[in-house]
A protein has these predicted regions:
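Hydrophobic alpha-helical segments
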Residues: 1-222
Length: 222
């Protein structure tokens, strides 16, 4: 079964947990109580949007780490939505993610990424599998590749946090869209306002985004 066939199959599933709000993905969990939604959106902003002490990786690169973790956990909603968020954030910054690079990321690869991003992907994927498998050698390799302590801390926290989000979505069997295109509108809102802004609230940016560069996110500069 191809990934798209599996995506469509999941979109057609009936939730096995009753009483869920009729919204897709993590939105179903967020609407179970007002405070739960507030804190889940706030955590996403802390991990993916807000300044993090000592971190040098961009918002787009943080979204790519969330995409890789979600792909490893086989959570199609989170994988597709954060891939769309990464593309929207990078486009807003005048950058892009080549499809081949994103496909590699979703299949567990690091092709096309520079050594620092590849090392951070390795850290996030290791923590996703089993946190205690992360070694001092993994951390030292990331530092040697140019990662800061803040970058490494974020890679660990994103792996842990998005494993939680992934299990909320799939444990509740929340609805998944049959096509990644379904996430583009919300992704454009998040690129401008972050996660705490309600859906449909984005306003156009006050100035035009910079002209797109051809350099992809975290690309190897050889």
């Amino acid at each position: 079964m191809t990934r798209q066939e599996e995506r469509v199959r999941r979109a057609q599933q009936t939730p096995i947990v009753g009483g869920l709000p009729d919204v897709p993905g993590i939105g179903a969990a967020m609407r179970l109580t007002p405070n739960l939604g507030l804190h889940l959106r706030g955590l996403a902003d802390e991990l993916l949007v807000h300044d993090f002490p000592g971190a040098t990786i961009t918002r787009g690169e943080r979204e790519l780490l969330a995409t890789a973790v979600s792909a490893g956990n086989d959570c199609f909603f989170c994988m597709d939505s954060h891939a769309a968020h990464a593309a929207a954030v990078l486009e807003h910054d005048g950058r892009h993610v080549p499809h081949a690079q994103l496909d590699s990321l979703e299949l567990g690869g690091s092709e096309g990424f520079d050594p620092k991003m590849a090392a951070l992907l390795h850290i996030s994927r290791t923590v996703r599998r089993s946190a205690l498998q992360l070694t001092a050698d993994d951390v030292e390799a990331a530092i040697a590749a140019g990662a800061s302590n803040g970058d490494i801390q974020l890679a660990v926290l994103i792996a842990a946090g998005f494993s939680m989000y992934n299990r909320m979505v799939d444990g509740l069997r929340a609805r998944t869209a049959p096509s990644p295109d379904a996430y583009r509108q919300r992704a454009a809102e998040i690129a401008v306002q972050g996660y705490s802004a309600p859906a449909g609230s984005s306003a156009p940016p006050t100035s035009s985004p910079p002209t797109a560069r051809t350099e992809p996110a975290g690309a190897s500069r050889g």
